Amino acid sequence: MSASPSIRPTAGIAPPLLDLRIARKLYGDRTILSDIALQVARGEIVCVVGPSGCGKSTLLRIVAGLDPDFRGSVTLDGSALAGPSARVGVIFQEPRLLPWLSIADNVGFASGARGGRDPSVERLLDEVGLAGVARQLPATLSGGMAQRAAIARGLFGEPDLLLLDEPFSAVDAITRMRLQTLLLDVVHRHRMAAIVVTHDLDEALYLGDRVLMLAPNPGRVDDEIQVDVARPRDRRDPSLAAQRARLIDAFQRFHDRAAGDPAGIPITSA
């Protein structure tokens, strides 16, 4: 399937908050991303999936202002972004909490204040269920609690856009599902937009209003799925099965092409 020239917000959602244009992104002589045009509306969650090495994390770094060396533009609410911005929150695969600071000081790190009581930090910790551990150090938290602290830190300063790079891949299945539901709650409550990079197809279909499939060599949008399933979603909803099969077929195609085997070995058994 050929790349889409422009990926628009889901029908019925407000005008775009984010307008991303990547004509080309190079690493040395290799083209990592090419011909990407993506718009995301406020209140919308877009999930990005694709095989390893297709440029998913690079795309997030560009939007976050951490990788300015590309041909194109990033516009947020009509204003060009040329570097990191308080209007864009980032949540990584690992919590990356500073071990010598309390949970509260980690969440409010960008403010520069330490040791005091910040009402906005206290509100965020309460929102993610960590009000009782504000003065504890990161080493005392479970993996799921640490990632909730990272979500609170990403929300500090009331960003308009939240970027998440495989945020729940390092926790167990039940914790992952709880964190996914927490993410949906905070995106809805704060009326922000979110882009989630994930390798988990079920996670993408549960979280996303849209799912973008990136093809590799170079990274480009190969397919877009509108997830027209009402929220709150049931993870067992059979209407998600056909969309999941479509994503699996795309992954099989990419892997077979990379291996030089057009027939390939089926992912599912007969």
From Swiss-Prot:
Alphabetic keyword roster: ATP-binding, Cell inner membrane, Cell membrane, Membrane, Nucleotide-binding, Translocase, Transport
Binding residues for ATP: G50, P51, S52, G53, C54, G55, K56, S57
Superkingdom field: Bacteria
GO annotation, cellular component aspect: plasma membrane
Reactions that this protein is recorded to catalyse: ATP + H2O + aliphatic sulfonate-[sulfonate-binding protein]Side 1 = ADP + phosphate + aliphatic sulfonateSide 2 + [sulfonate-binding protein]Side 1
Boundaries of every ABC transporter domain copy: 17-241
Subunit structure: The complex is composed of two ATP-binding proteins (SsuB), two transmembrane proteins (SsuC) and a solute-binding protein (SsuA).
Protein name: Aliphatic sulfonates import ATP-binding protein SsuB 2
Organism per entry: Burkholderia cenocepacia (strain HI2424)
